[in-house]
Design a protein with these regions (language model features):
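N-terminal pre-catalytic "stem/leader" segment of glycosyltransferase-like enzymes
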Residues: 1-20
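A short helix->loop->beta-strand "cap" motif at the edges of active sites that frequently abuts
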Residues: 22, 75-80, 197-201
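Active-site-proximal beta-strand elements of phosphoester/diester hydrolases
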Residues: 6-9, 24-27, 112-118, 133-139, ...
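Metallo-beta-lactamase
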Residues: 77-132
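Pre-active-site segment of Zn-dependent metallo-hydrolases
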Residues: 16-73, 140-170
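Active-site environment of divalent metal-dependent phosphoester hydrolases
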Residues: 32-33, 60-68, 86-91, 104-106, ...
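Cap/insert and terminal regions of metallo-dependent hydrolase folds
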Residues: 145-201
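A short acidic, amphipathic alpha-helical/loop segment
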Residues: 67-73, 93, 190-195
């Protein structure tokens, strides 16, 4: 089978993956985006032509859950929202919302979704659609600050992160979205380097 995916980056952890019949939206954030001109933001014209639109919210933080934007899209579009449990607060009553937690696995809108853990709040997602496998880490990362943390704190952070990553299938992921935060200081990319070697996207 021929595989094709178009990846669009918006801001912070916000990405879309456009397949032939499926649009996958991760952590879309629009509120307060001075970096993007209005014509660069995701709009309903971008939804046209897709049979299924999957909108993933990995946690309830403002970085990942822009309620004003994502729930304003017309209900006539074939949109399914997949939310972590903590993101359900103040969510409008819409017909196509799926709430999930770590360890869940289910099929929705002709896609298979596996839900993995996080080392912060919420979850991470593995999505398989149209023979393409995409992983979005949410806030899963090796959260350590080498200049500030004690050795014990760093060790605990490493153990927690390695444990979460070990659950993700190897040699299966085609596209991996993972956070990088230079505010962590030295070795801020340690988590990204590890997940690349571990799951080999």
């Amino acid at each position: 089978m021929s595989r094709h995916a178009l990846v669009t980056y918006f801001y912070q952890s916000a990405f879309t993956v456009s397949l032939k019949k499926t649009l996958i939206v991760f952590s879309y954030r629009q509120t307060g985006l001075s970096q993007l001109a209005p014509e660069q933001q995701l709009s309903e014209k971008d939804f046209q032509g897709f049979n299924n639109i999957l909108v993933f919210v990995p946690n309830n933080s403002l970085t990942h859950h822009d309620r004003k934007a994502i729930y304003s899209w017309k209900p006539s579009f074939p949109i399914t929202y997949i939310l972590s449990e903590d993101a359900m607060k103040d969510t409008p009553d819409l017909p196509h919302i799926r709430v999930c937690r770590e360890g869940d696995s289910f099929s929705v809108a002709q896609a298979k979704v596996s839900v993995f853990g996080s080392t912060d709040t919420g979850v991470s997602y593995l999505v398989e659609a149209e023979d393409v496998c995409v992983f979005h880490a949410g806030d899963l990362n090796l959260w350590h600050w080498r200049e500030e943390n004690t050795l014990r704190e760093i060790t605990r952070a490493e153990e927690s992160f390695y444990d979460k990553v070990a659950a993700i299938p190897k040699d299966k992921v085609d596209i991996c979205f993972f956070p990088l935060d230079p505010n962590q200081g030295g070795l801020y990319d340690a988590g990204a380097n590890h997940i690349i070697m571990a799951i080999r996207p």
